[in-house]
Every structure is written in structure tokens, then in C-alpha cells.
Amino acid sequence: ASDVYKRQELFPNAISKRMDWDTTRGKFSFDKIINSFAKQEIDILIGTQMITKGLDFKNIGLVGVINTDHFLNFPDFRAHEKAFQTLTQVAGRSGRSGDRGKVLMQTYQPEHPIIKNVIENDYEKMYQNQLLERKDYNYPPFVRLIRITIKDKSYEKLNNSGDWLNRVIRDNYKGIVLGPVYPEISRIKNKYHKQFLIKLRNLDELNRFRSIFQKIQKSFDSISKYRSVRIIVDVDPI
């Protein structure tokens, strides 16, 4: 509400619209907002990342990205690659009939390599830096990944079952095992989540771990107090 008030105070004559999940739930809501903006019936369009998804607007003089650091600090090994893609897409939306528009990015990390790559539109440098980083920290394409997620309504039961799995996995597999940790969103539909991440050097190692974990899961399923805990195994998670 304060943002709306501030916007009206700064641009009293401007017509503005929001584009997010709430405002595009209706059958034709998305298209209606897009068409209105294309016809210049809307002066300021404020929204989430969906604004960048394949939309090509003309006559945009200024694009602003709020909290760019959210993209850079997201807990995912692909975060920097995705940040570059999104910010480059956003920058590409700005311009009037062949003239260059302006892009403003709010950040506490103006010297961050990804911010510099975006400003310089240097995909090759971003690509090479990301390859080196992933090789150093054992991430794809240099390893395969298995993500194991456990879910339960009981916080205590989830932690206890996670401790059991952690001990048994590490006793039976001597490769790289990370976790268990709570993901950024740790409770969905009234269930708590915890995750393991297994890093595997090749397909043989992946198959060996899957065979080991199938036996572990059988033992886990036989423990009555953990019967409600759900296990999801995701190979090469996206």
C-alpha cells in the first residue's frame, strides 16, 4: 500500500498496473494487461518476472529491477546463470523505436561479476566463469546430482528421520553427501521439508548410489514411527 501511495505521489498523472499471479488469474487478464500496455494505455507496469517471459514491448524508456541481489543470492548453483539470463532479458525490453532505453538495477553488489557481465552484455565471460566455479565446487556439468527430499507434518519426526537417514547414508556411501538442510521454502501444504544433495562423478557412481539407497529406503520404510514420512528422489534436479 505504501508503494502505491509513493508512486501516486511521484507520478500523479501516470496510469499504472500490476502484473503478477494475483492480477492474471482471470481467463484473459494476462492478455488484457499486455494489450493495454502495448497500446500505451498504461504508463507504468509493475510486476514479477513474468513481465520478462517472451514479451516484446515497444516504446519503453525505462526499466527498473528492484532487489537484484535476490537473483544473485538465491541458494541454487544455477543462480548466477539465471540472474544473467533474467537481467539480460529485462535490459532488452528497454528502448524506443531503435533508441536505447535506460535500465536501473537496485543492488548492494555493484561490483558483482554477474552485474558487470550484464552491463557489458558479455555472455562468453559469464559462461567461462560459471564453468570454472562449477568445476571447483563439484556441480554439473562436471558431476551428476541426486536430490533426496523428505516431508512430514511433524517437525520433530522430520528431524529425527533426517538424522537416521543421514547416519545410514554416510555409513554406506563414502561420496559427497550434503545435508540434510531446510530449503528456502521449508513448509508447503502443512508439511515440513528437508533435503539431501548427493554429488556423483559419473553414471556408474550414480547407479551404485541408487542401488545402495533402495536398500536404505526399504529399511527406512520398515520403521513404524517413520511411516508417515515421505521420501522423494530426484535425479539431476532442474
Segments predicted by a language model, with ranges:
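Short, small-residue-biased leader/transition segments that mark boundaries at the very start
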Residues: 1-5
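Accessory helical-bundle/CTD segments and flexible terminal tails appended to RecA-like ATPase motors
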Residues: 10-17, 26-74, 89-238
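Short, conserved loop/turn and helix-capping segments at secondary-structure boundaries
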Residues: 77-84
